[in-house]
Each structure stands twice: as C-alpha cells, then as structure tokens.
Amino acid sequence: MTQVRRWDSACQKLPDANLALISVAGEYAAELANQALDRNLNVMMFSDNVTLEDEIQLKTRAREKGLLVMGPDCGTSMIAATPLAFANVMPEGNIGVIGASGTGIQELCSQIALAGKRIFTRLVLAGAISAVKWAASVR
C-alpha cells in the first residue's frame, strides 16, 4: 500500500471514497472537515476541542449537501456492519443504534450482542451537549 502525505494525494488515490476520518488537533479539524464536505465526503471527526460554532456550521452544511458529520469527538461508529475507528466487531443483524456517546453506544451494543441479538449500524453524532445545542439551533 502506498502512503500519501497530502489531502489531494489521498483523494486521488481513493476517488470512490465516501467518508473522511479526521483525527488532527481540534483547531485544524473544522478546516479539514470543510475540505471533505467540498469533495462530497461524509465526515467522521475523531478530533475533539472543536468549537460549537464550527460544529454547527459543519453539520448544517453537511445536511444541506445530504451528507453526515459524526463528531467531533467521535471515536467509534459502525455503518452497514463495518466498524470504524475504535469499534468492536459485532455479529451482523438488523438493529440500529444512534446516540451522542460513543462509549455509551459501544457498551449498549456489547450488551445487545451478549444477549444474542445482532447490530447492523451504530452512529455516534457528537458529544451530548453539542448534539442538543445543535438540534435546538436547527429547529
């Protein structure tokens, strides 16, 4: 596998990608997330310390483009039974879980799996306070 060091090189290497996982210092994360949205990529933002204003701007812009921004501070998700970042591999099934706390969702899904049920998708959208403030701002 060839390594890339620049954003444009990565996008050229994977032209069919539909998701960007961003893990940089929070002060730089919004700029990179906006670049991903410019390229019509969904965003999973592992970075924390992103301002609420940046989070609202990113999520509003993503919604307008029909895209998804998970995070900031999103360290785990699973989409269509594919684990992303720090996610446990779970038996594939038909249950979907959406929430604000990645570790909370991870624990819930582990308990569901231990009970013999199967998970299809789990999405972590943001920290609880940010998610509530964002939801209130877009009403």
Which sequence ranges carry the predicted segments?
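Catalytic-core regions of core metabolic enzymes
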Residues: M1-R139
